[in-house]
Amino acid sequence: MELHILEHRLQVASVAKESIPLFTYGLIKLAFLSSKTRCKFFSLTETPEDYTIIVDEEGFLELPSSEHLSVADATWLALNVVSGGGSFSSSQPIGVTKIAKSVIAPLADQNISVFMLSTYQTDFILVRERDLPFVTHTLSSEFTILRVVNGETVAAENLGITNGFVKPKLVQRPVIHPLSSPSNRFCVTSLDPDTLPAVATLLMDVMFYSNGVKDPMATGDDCGHIRFFSFSLIEGYISLVMDVQTQQRFPSNLLFTSASGELWKMVRIGGQPLGFDECGIVAQISEPLAAADIPAYYISTFKFDHALVPEENINGVISALKVSQAEKH
């Protein structure tokens, strides 16, 4: 297996809902007019609390500097596990549970914080640039580590870090944060970038203006329904995560879906904003899922984390995570 260190240097930022009008010009340019920018990595996720933006340095320049933009204090690098060579677009998707044991747990054991972004195409593991020597040292026994430089994949240099390493103990990692599962059913999909102009107006409405149109058939007091929408445009590939009500607004022939038309339920992790320094949160969730062989997407945002699991598995997942939660007491 290969671990690719991509060349994007990323910023992770948050914008409050009420401040988003200050940023829509730049965000629309990044999402819909990418040929007019040098940005190659852009992701925007709306949650009930805020908008999380993950963007490379070139794309970050498109956003106005403002007190309303909270930026995480670090430059982040994206790692990508590739099975069978080739770029992330052509390789088989691995799924966050498949990398739980090989990537996520070892990094948690070394107290290296990660920020996850699963897309339709692949899973990106974001690590702080300053942690990279520790990351490569930790994972070098499991992976051939390659670095993308000017679009070419080359062997990553071994930075020879040895001090500061602890022999990982096989620790139990109980789930320590509150969990909730909204009532929404989600799909993870994509569309051909050539068809983006055909749905640009609709996408802009969904992203910035519609404020989450609820299913008119749903009961008016569906308090379990949350606002969640994620759009990523990374190296020319689009990924969309949206609930079924939002999906129904799109022409059905434009969205790619899995042949099974699988729907996903969400586990939301966190009662208070999680911050960026705590290690092991992704591992706490992904390890029990991996043990049960349940596929999952995982999307970290500025304040909370989100795991998506197949709809039919949600009750079992919640039970397994609650058992893990009980173990901390």
Curated annotation (Swiss-Prot):
Assembly: Forms homodimers and heterodimers with CASTOR1. Interacts with the GATOR2 complex which is composed of MIOS, SEC13, SEH1L, WDR24 and WDR59; the interaction is not regulated by arginine.
Organism: Homo sapiens (Human)
Tissues expressed in: Widely expressed.
Main function: Functions as a negative regulator of the TORC1 signaling pathway through the GATOR complex. As part of homodimers or heterodimers with CASTOR1, directly binds and inhibits the GATOR subcomplex GATOR2 and thereby mTORC1. Does not directly bind arginine, but binding of arginine to CASTOR1 disrupts the interaction of CASTOR2-containing heterodimers with GATOR2 which can in turn activate mTORC1 and the TORC1 signaling pathway.
One term of GO molecular function: identical protein binding
Record PANTHER family: CHROMOSOME 1, WHOLE GENOME SHOTGUN SEQUENCE (PTHR31131), CYTOSOLIC ARGININE SENSOR FOR MTORC1 SUBUNIT 2 (PTHR31131:SF2)
A Gene Ontology term for the protein's cellular component: cytosol
Gene Ontology biological process: cellular response to L-arginine; negative regulation of TORC1 signaling
Protein name: Cytosolic arginine sensor for mTORC1 subunit 2
